[in-house]
Swiss-Prot record:
Component of ribosome-associated complex (RAC). InterPro entries: ATPase_NBD, HSP70_peptide-bd_sf, Hsp_70_fam, HSPA14_NBD. Belongs to the heat shock protein 70 family. Component of the ribosome-associated complex (RAC), a complex involved in folding or maintaining nascent polypeptides in a folding-competent state. This is Heat shock 70 kDa protein 14-B. It comes from the Eukaryota. It comes from Xenopus laevis (African clawed frog). Pfam families: HSP70 (PF00012). GO terms for biological process: chaperone cofactor-dependent protein refolding; protein refolding.
C-alpha cells in the first residue's frame, strides 16, 4: 500500500506519493501537478480545481476560494471577518460558525468550511488513486506552524470525511526539511536552516536548528498581508492601465472584467518564472473588446518592486530576532509557489551569498513531498531512524484564565516555541465558599488580545466541600507530548479531588 502526503494551501492543493523509495508529486486529471483550491457549485454538479477557478468569472457568488483562511474559526474571528469581507460568495453566521450561502437557482443551502475542504481533499484522494491505480487511505497532512487546535481539528475532520486515515499532521517547515533529507545525511552535525515560504496569501519565515537529527524551531513569523496573490493583483492593475491607455476605458470598477484580468495575470506571473516575457490575451474583456498585451519579466519586476522589498524585510527581522548574522545560516529552503519567482530568489541569494539555497524541488511541491516521505516512514516503507526528524515545540501560547472578578486575567502556562515534551504547572486561587470550579484554557498567537474565540478546552471540578473562609488552591498541570497531544490535570489541594482531560493531536 502506498503512502501519500497532502498539502492544502490557501490558493492551491497538492498531493505526493511515496513509492519505491522516493516521493513524487502526481498530476491531476488536467495534467497539472498543483490544483487550485477552488470549489464551484453549479446547478447540476460541484466542480473542484482548475474548472472551478476558470468558471468563477461567471459564477463568482457560488465559487469558494481561500477556504483555509476560515477553516476552524468562529464567525467573529478577525481573520474570518477579513475573509468574509473579501469573499464574493455570501458568508452568514450559523451557530457561531461561518457558513457559505450557495444559491444555484436549483438549490439553496449553507455550506461549512469543513465541507469545502472535504471536497478538495477528495480531489487529492482521486488524483493519488488515479496515479497509483489503487485505493489509498493513509495520509500525512501538512499544517502551518501557527495553526491552532480548532483549525487542526477542522482540517482533520475534513480529511477524514474525504475517506482519509490521518497518520499524522506535520508542520510545513518540518515537511520542507524532510523533503531535502536535512538532518539525515549528517545526524550528528549541527546547522541552522531558514525555511522561507511565500504562499498564495501569506509569507512565513522560520529558523530551525538541526542537531543530532532533531529539529528545533528558534523563531517563526507569519505575515498575512503579503502573498502570491499580491503579485497577481499588481500585474492585473498594470494590465487594466494598459487597457485604459489603449481603449480609453477604465475597467477597474468592473468586477467581471477585473476577474478576467486576474486570471490572465496569474497565468502570466507563472510563465514569467521561466520565460523572459508572456502574452496576456483576454477574449472579450470589456464591451466586446479582445485585449492582447505582452509583459516582460523586467516590467513585471518593476511593477512589483515594492512587493519584493516586503518579501525580504521579514528575513532581516527574523535574523535580528534570533541574534544571527547571515553567515550563521547554513541553508535556505524555498517553499510556496511564489518562491519560484527568479527576482525573489536573487534577492534572497544576495542576503546569503555564501549560503546553500535549496530549490531543486519545485517550491510549490516541496511541502507535500516531505509529507509523503513522513507517511512512508510511518508505514515502515523507509528507514525508521528518520522518524526522529520532527519539529518539537509548541506552536502557540497556552494560557489559563485566572479565577478572579475581572474575568480577563490570563497566565501563560506554555509559551509558543517551547521544546517538547514539556510540563508546566500553576496554582490558581478560587473562593473557598464554592462547590465547583471551571478552569478555562485558551490559545493565542501572541499578536492579538485573548478572546472567547480562543478558548479550546475547560476542566470542571465538581462536588467540592465548601470552606467557611479563605481561598481554595487549584493545581493545574499541563503536559504537551512530542506528538502535540495535551494532557491537563486540575487538582483541589485541600481534598485531593482531581479531573483530567486529554486533547489528542495527530501532528
Amino acid at each position: 500500500m502506498a503512502a501519500i502526503g497532502v498539502h492544502l494551501g490557501c490558493t492551491c492543493a497538492c498531493v505526493a506519493v511515496f513509492k519505491d523509495g522516493r516521493a513524487d508529486v502526481v498530476a491531476n486529471d488536467a495534467g497539472d501537478r498543483v490544483t487550485p483550491a477552488v470549489v464551484g457549485f453549479l446547478e447540476k454538479e460541484v466542480i473542484v480545481g482548475l474548472a472551478a477557478k476558470q468558471s468563477r468569472v461567471r459564477n463568482a457568488t457560488n465559487t469558494i476560494v481561500k477556504v483555509k483562511q476560515i477553516l476552524g474559526r468562529s464567525y467573529g474571528d478577525p481573520i474570518a471577518q477579513k475573509h468574509i469581507t473579501e469573499s464574493k460568495c455570501t458568508v452568514v453566521e450559523k451557530g457561531g460558525k461561518p457558513k457559505y450561502e450557495i444559491d444555484t437557482g436549483e438549490t439553496q443551502k449553507l455550506v461549512s468550511s469543513e465541507d469545502v475542504a472535504k471536497l478538495i481533499f477528495s480531489k487529492m484522494k482521486e488524483t493519488a488513486q488515479s496515479a497509483l491505480g489503487s485505493d489509498v487511505n493513509d495520509v500525512v497532512i501538512t499544517v502551518p506552524f501557527d495553526f491552532g487546535e480548532s483549525q487542526k481539528k477542522a482540517l482533520g475532520e475534513a480529511a477524514s470525511a474525504a475517506g482519509f486515515n490521518i497518520l499524522r499532521m506535520i508542520h510545513e517547515p518540518s515537511a520542507a526539511l524532510l523533503a531535502y533529507g536535512i538532518g539525515q545525511e549528517s545526524p550528528t552535525g549541527k546547522s541552522n536552516v531558514l525555511v522561507y515560504k511565500l504562499g498564495g496569501t501569506s509569507l512565513s519565515v522560520t529558523m530551525i536548528e538541526v542537531n543530532s537529527g532533531i529539529y528545533r524551531v528558534l523563531a517563526t513569523s507569519t505575515y498575512d498581508g503579503i502573498g502570491g496573490v499580491c503579485f497577481t493583483e499588481a500585474l492585473a492593475q498594470h494590465l487594466a492601465s494598459e487597457f485604459q491607455r489603449t481603449y480609453k476605458q477604465d475597467i477597474r470598477g468592473n468586477a467581471r472584467a477585473m476577474m478576467k484580468l486576474m486570471n490572465s495575470a496569474d497565468v502570466a506571473k507563472h510563465a514569467l518564472s521561466t520565460l523572459g516575457s508572456s502574452n496576456c490575451f483576454v477574449d472579450s474583456l470589456y464591451d466586446g473588446i479582445d485585449f492582447d498585451c505582452s509583459v516582460s519579466r523586467a516590467r513585471f519586476e518593476l511593477i512589483c518592486s515594492s512587493l519584493f522589498n516586503q518579501c525580504i524585510d521579514p528575513i532581516k527581522k527574523l535574523l535580528e530576532q534570533v541574534g544571527f548574522k547571515a553567515t550563521d545560516v547554513n541553508q535556505v529552503v524555498l517553499c510556496g509557489g511564489s518562491a519560484r519567482i527568479p527576482k525573489l530568489q536573487q534577492l534572497i541569494k544576495d542576503l546569503f551569498p555564501e549560503v546553500e539555497m535549496l530549490s531543486s524541488i519545485p517550491p510549490d511541491e516541496v511541502i507535500p513531498v516531505g509529507a509523503a516521505i513522513q507517511a512512508g516512514i510511518l508505514l515502515g516503507k523507509e528507514n525508521t531512524d528518520l522518524d526522529t526528524i520532527t519539529i518539537e515545540c509548541s506552536a502557540s501560547d497556552m494560557l489559563v484564565k485566572e479565577i478572579d472578578e475581572s474575568g480577563n486575567k490570563f497566565t501563560v502556562l506554555l509559551p509558543s516555541g517551547t521544546p517538547l515534551p514539556a510540563r508546566r504547572q500553576h496554582v490558581l486561587q478560587a473562593p473557598g465558599n464554592i462547590s465547583s470550579v471551571c478552569l478555562e484554557l485558551y490559545e493565542s498567537d501572541g499578536k492579538s488580545s485573548v478572546s472567547e474565540e480562543c478558548k479550546f478546552a475547560q476542566v470542571v471540578l465538581k462536588d467540592l466541600q465548601k470552606k467557611t473562609s479563605g481561598v481554595r488552591d487549584i493545581l493545574t498541570v499541563l503536559t504537551m507530548k512530542r506528538d502535540g497531544s495535551l494532557h491537563i490535570t486540575c487538582t483541589d489541594k485541600d481534598s485531593g479531588k482531581s479531573e483530567m482531560i486529554t486533547i489528542e493531536d495527530t501532528s
